[in-house]
Amino acid sequence: MTQTATAPISPESRAERPRSHWDRVATAAEHQHWDAVASGVAEILAADVLERDRGNLDPTTELEPLRSSGLVNLLDPAEFGGGGAVWSTAFRVIRILAAADASLAQILLYHYVNSANIAFSAPESERERFYRATIEGRWLWGDSVNPVDPDLELTPRGDGFELNGLKRFSTGVSSGDAVLVNAVIATGDRAGETLTFVLPRDRAGIEPLGDWDFLGQRQSASGSVRFTGVRVDASEILGALVDEPFATLITPSIQLGFGNLYLGIAQGALAKGRGLTLGRKNSWFLSGVETYAQDPFVRRLYGELVAHTAAAEALADRVGALHDAEVARGAAVTAESRAAQAIEIAKVKIVTDALALDVTTRIYEATGSSSAKSAIGLDLYWRNVRTHSLHDPVDYKKLEVGANYLTGDVQPLSLYT
């Protein structure tokens, strides 16, 4: 995407701006444009996805299409050279990429959420410099945020801090350009406060350990990172974790991203299965038809899986539009409206989790025993969704939705709810 230089925003103009630049819902033209861009990138990624998965190495050059296409800056403000798109557009992009390469789709999803902390966490007066840096550098943002692994220590040092510790599941750090970190201040007047800050990936003392060796999402660069005496400058701090309703939309945003990731994996498995089924030139001897594509039981199975996938897509699209509208409310977002949106997103997560596991398992019933060959790689879809769907237990999403439906209860704010 072409980037053009723009003049800095004056303090007077800045004061009149909405809470974020995501102050509208997506247009059909926006969706169509970025769908096409994502489809082109997905085609590139699909060409060698199996070989890269088997290599089990963190991605490097294969991330370049995400940068050169403009996808890395899709959610950034247009006034600074970004794509100027809104969240539902980003979720559709993740869905399209996940159908081809769920690992790189995960890296991009986390990048979107990580870099969105500029809008959700940083003061308005500081956002422009962060956005200009990430847009001009086409940064990919990884993170060391995993809230169930609070093993980082942030110690005051002069005007800044020193970071030490180990953080597991640090998606994108080993392959990215910037590292988003949440850490609790250990000592001093601000002890106990959680800060959000962004560091350059090449900062001394940041050491990815290369220990990501899992069943699926093998190229998601989600290994552990050790921080040893890492300098954190005051200028690198985005802000402190707060319970302002608008700022806490960061968590529902990534949860809706997960739902679209799973939906995309299901769609990819269906498309792969269709090609395999149409390529089978014989049939089961009791079927009374010439090919498996004509077999009534195969057709029945596809009918069921396609219908369920279409229903999940409709739900994801509806909730994506609701999310655009909720984010666009900015400072008018309330605890109640935020909670209502989180419930809608939990519904998407529940449905797409079950759908993707079902589709990626049962597709073999339509493609037959020959499709179990390692060379075909149909297992990639199941391995990927089975791995990532364990990120946070979907049973607790069911609990959220059920409790809200019965008694109106909502879950307390956290980095998972």
Summary of predicted features, one role per range:
Residues M1-L109:
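Amphipathic, small/basic residue-rich leader segments at the start of a protein or domain
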Residues A46, L50-D53, A310-K347, Y364-S369:
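C-terminal helix-coil-helix/basic helical segment that borders enzyme active sites and/or dimer interfaces
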Residues L63-P65, G288-Q294, A325-E344, S369-T387, ...:
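Charge-rich, acidic-biased intrinsically disordered regions
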